[in-house]
C-alpha cells in the first residue's frame, strides 16, 4: 500500500492530498497545518518517495492504489485535492471509484491530449535525466514557488522519483484524454488553473465546467502552475470553502463559457 503521512486523525472530514510529479507527500505539510480542522492524509504516489517501489504503469492503476489507501482509512467518503500529476490521478479516481470521494479540488491539468512534435517529446525525454541533479531539481522547485530544497530529494540527496518514472508520467500527462468521460463524473468538483498556465490547461477549464454535471472552474489571476506554493493562504481558504460548501474566495476569477 502507498506510504502516507497524516495529521489530525480525529477530525470529522478527511482530505487526501495528491502531489505533483517529482515531489512526494511532504509538499503538503504547510497546507495540512493550515487546514487543521480537517484530517489530512498525504500519500507518496506510485514511483515517488517511500512509495517508489510501486511502479507507475498508468493513471488508472495509480488511482486504484489511492483507492486502496482511502478504503483502509474507513469512515465516510473523503475530500480529494490534487496538483498536476495528482489531478490526473484524482480524476481517474472519480471515474473508477466515485463512492470514495464526496468532493474534489484539482489544479493544473487538461481534459484532452496536448499536441507536441516528436522533437519536443525527445527534448522532454532528455530533460528528465537533468532531474538526477539535485541542483536542477531545486531550480525547478523554485520556479514553482517551492523554496524548501529538501522537498525535491530523499535522504542522501536521491531524487523523489527516477528519471524513468518522470518520463513515463510526462508521456501519460501529454496523452491524457477524458473528453468522453466528463459527463459521467458526478462528484462535486472544483477545477483551478493559474492565469499564466499552459494554454491547453486554460482552454480545458470551460470544458470541465460545462461537461461535468457538478463542476465549477476558476482562474487564479497573475499566477502559474505553482500558484499553490506562492499563495498557500488562498489555496487553504479555497479548499476549506469548497469542502464545507461555502462561497469561494473573491481572489478567484470565474470562467466564461467555451
Label the predicted regions.
Residues 6-52:
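Conserved HGGG/HGGXW glycine-rich cap/lid loop of the alpha/beta-hydrolase fold
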Residues 82-86, 90:
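Gly/Ala-rich beta-loop-alpha elbow adjacent to hydrolase catalytic centers
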Residues 115-117, 131-183:
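Conserved alpha/beta-hydrolase catalytic His-Asp/Glu region
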Residues 215-258:
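Catalytic active-site module of serine/aspartate enzymes centered on a nucleophile-bearing elbow/loop
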Residues 185, 191-193:
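Short beta-strand/loop motif that positions the catalytic acidic residue
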Residues 91-96, 101-131:
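Flexible "cap/lid" loop of the alpha/beta hydrolase fold
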Residues 1-16, 36-39, 74-76, 160, ...:
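Alpha/beta-hydrolase fold catalytic core
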Residues 29-30, 39-81, 237:
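Active-site loop/oxyanion-hole signature of alpha/beta-hydrolase fold enzymes
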